[in-house]
């Protein structure tokens, strides 16, 4: 078995160096016996043995796509974890012009064009709601599955041993994509006795931010998991203030959500978040509608119920890890019935 892992960032390098948790490899790290080179690894015998190669594909040119297309014929499976090539190769696959099995994680709707004009042999979604939305546009017998993404808790447990964990902040907002930081800042003004920190870069400073208030800015140009771990350990509650969207939200904020699960942090997020139902069903956080009154209420509730939410998240974390994702992924990659 030969697998080609395709992503738009080289997580395998950072995971190998221990500076990034392995859930950024979307289940394959647990299948690896050892790396032969920085970009190539041998699979464990229980996963059929064989080899997995890693390739970064970000905004490829036509020539780069042609070269990659030719390369793919040497593999049994192409695992596209961030939909980097499935639009192009999926069209070829639909017309039986793509030899390997194409397994794709679909993250953000709308899915209609991708489902109609391209075909992945196995389409993976992080929630049942996203999967059901995609199926509305499918008219063939392709495999469509839900496989919920969860964190590699061991990475957090090991790395937090050497870090300070005294709580300095009540709230952490550490995302950039589709976040309403200004709404969060306005709500914090209603809570002058509490403190928060927002992770951003100098090009995207929230317009509502005023120096000297109860919200600090932490500047970071490139993602750094160890830095985020330190901030998480200094904070009680994670806030994911997703922007309002009339359409279904994809798993935006999922990386921050992984941090909360691994560390037992209660979470506050938009009721339209992809993982909102899971939060409610397991009592691990508070949801809000996108207005100041609702968010402020959710922030207050998360502190009032902190111990209960924290304990529930710790319990949830114990039974929801990347190993569950790997177990299901193994079936998809090797064409086993699920």
For each feature predicted by the language model, list its residue ranges.
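N-terminal subdomain of nucleotide-sugar transferases
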Residues: 1-46, 189-192
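Donor nucleotide-sugar binding/catalytic pocket of nucleotide-sugar-dependent glycosyltransferases
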Residues: 121-158
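Conserved donor-binding/catalytic core segment of Leloir-type glycosyltransferases
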Residues: 163-181, 185-191, 197
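Nucleotide-activated donor-binding/catalytic signature segment of Leloir-type glycosyltransferases, i.e.
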Residues: 206-237
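Nucleotide-sugar-dependent
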Residues: 226, 240-258, 269-277
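A short alpha->beta transition loop at the rim of the catalytic pocket in nucleotide-sugar-dependent
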Residues: 236, 264-266
